[in-house]
Amino acid sequence: MNLLSFDIEEWYIEYLCTRNNDKYKEYQRYLDTILDKLDICGLKATFFCVGEMGKFFPEVVRQIQERGHEIGCHSNKHTWLNKMTPDECKDDTRYAVDNLEQCIGKKVKS
């Protein structure tokens, strides 16, 4: 069981808002630092990713998973829950899980 978690969505939020990836390398450097520190400490964590990251930035999601960490689902597009009907929320979650599972090739549990 992981007791440490991170929300990883900066790549997607920037792309969604600006349609560019200007800060990609900066975000990647921060993620590399986090993953390296976790390795040094012998810790594993759950990284919650929006489903769209599995579609637009699969290399980021795969990197986290390949370093032995769990990928968790943090919705598909980070839409406010109070802006969705229950059916829309269910569909959003299903689509997000599908995107992430296709990306990493295994079940998303969180």
For each of these PLM feature ranges, what is it?
Residues 1-110:
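Catalytic alpha-helical scaffold of carbohydrate-active enzymes acting on polysaccharides/glycoconjugates
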